[in-house]
Amino acid sequence: MDRINGLSDEIICHILSFLPTKESALTSVLSKRWRNLFALTPNLHLVDDDLEVGGCGQTLIDFVDRVLAVSSNLPIREFSIKC
């Protein structure tokens, strides 16, 4: 077992909470265990540049809707959008 997989889900989610939401979501491909961990983070940091559109637009709104749908039952501690 590698060291990161020895960490609890709570610790991994805490680490993921410091990443922009899109980068945090990209970790879901690492293994079955990681598939939904990004959705358990209490912070949502959305960056419009990651969505490859100019200015805040419909693509950002769609992404926010998808993220909120996945994490709908969890309290949100921080929510930020950078356009």
Swiss-Prot record:
CDD domains: F-box_AtFBL13-like
Pfam families: F-box
Chain ranges of the F-box domain: 4-37
InterPro entries associated with the record: F-box-like_dom_sf (IPR036047), F-box_AtFBL13-like (IPR053781), F-box_dom (IPR001810), FBL60-like (IPR055294)
Matches recorded under SMART domains: FBOX
Domain of life: Eukaryota
Protein name listed in UniProt: F-box protein At1g19070
Organism: Arabidopsis thaliana
